[in-house]
Amino acid sequence: MARSWLDYKTQAWVQWCPGCGDFGILNSIYRAVSELGIDPENLAVVGGIGCSGRTTYYVKGSNFHALHGRAIPVATGVKLANPHLNVIVAGGDGDLMGIGGGHFVALGRRNLNITVLLFDNAVYGLTKGQAAPTLPAWVKTKALSMPNIHDNINPVLLAFAAGYTFIARGYAYHTQQLKELIKTAVRHRGAALVDILQPCPTYNNIMTNKWYEERIYYVDQEEGYDPIIRTPEEFQKKAPAIAAKLMEFGDRIPLGILYWNQTRESFEERLEKIMPGYMSAPPATRRIELEGKPFLHPFDIFKDRLVTP
């Protein structure tokens, strides 16, 4: 049953710069989870450090504001403890592609049922506009004293190589389309990435709204491109075209669902195979004490090594 988006709005004051793409992303999240009818008690938003991390304060749920780059491992623990929760990671390109890059890759390899929303503005907005991992080489934004000399990371291509089974790209100012992408990502069974391009009006004076609008287009309007993998055999056939589309970034930037593998089993399904009953009785629902005493008492582990006076 659909809910009102107001059911997910907290009383916290939203602290972002005027015109920030984060507003569009937040509104898209509100509407996506409300149209999916997700109870706030069954929603967990995990964020890292950066402007994007504040999302955890603005959406009602069992949320967690993690350390820099550590949103994905925290979300992994949340999801494994209670696989019935809808877990969303909200992180910036610096947080998830920089210090958190290793965790980003690990999530794809596991294919755990978590949705990653990558707030991608190519700068570190919270710390005065340094170059983030997604800023192309030789671009000089107004906060930089000289052009960026690092090559940029391509988040969607990295996700494809790591094993994510749903990869999409949206634009923060196109809230209707972004809402639909988030809904599909949350419904997907497995690791999902939505790379959300957004202007940073305060620090990125190059990749502005005008810059993006001149380049972005939606792949579903392009005849002949089918990103959906329905059988294992289809992957071998479609992988080259999908990889080429994921590499496309410059004069033309594709938006929409770029890759969707519906054949690979999720990490939870694999756990169920080696731990029968995991899904029906996950760790979060199991008793941790009996008659006031814990099931596992640490003294029992070390009783043969205890030194008594």
Swiss-Prot record:
It catalyses: a 2-oxocarboxylate + 2 oxidized [2Fe-2S]-[ferredoxin] + CoA = an acyl-CoA + 2 reduced [2Fe-2S]-[ferredoxin] + CO2 + H(+). InterPro entries: 2-oxoacid:Fd_oxidored_beta, 2-oxoacid:Fd_oxidoreductase, OFOB, PFO_beta_C, THDP-binding, TPP_enzyme_TPP-bd. It comes from the Archaea. Its cofactor is [4Fe-4S] cluster; thiamine diphosphate; Mg(2+). GO terms for molecular function: 2-oxobutyrate synthase activity; 2-oxoglutarate synthase activity; 4 iron, 4 sulfur cluster binding; magnesium ion binding; pyruvate synthase activity; thiamine pyrophosphate binding. Its EC number is 1.2.7.11. [4Fe-4S] cluster binds at residues 17, 20, 51, 200. The record marks 128 as: Plays an important role in the binding of CoA. Binds 1 [4Fe-4S] cluster per subunit. Keywords: Iron, Iron-sulfur, Magnesium, Metal-binding, Oxidoreductase, Thiamine pyrophosphate. Thiamine diphosphate binds at residues 49-52, 68, 94-95, 125-126. Optimum temperature is over 110 degrees Celsius. Mg(2+) binds at residues 93, 121, 123. Optimum pH is 8.5. Catalyzes the coenzyme A-dependent oxidative decarboxylation of different 2-oxoacids such as pyruvate, 2-oxobutyrate, glyoxylate and 2-oxoglutarate to form their CoA derivatives. Heterodimer composed of an alpha and a beta subunit. This is 2-oxoacid:ferredoxin oxidoreductase 2, subunit beta.
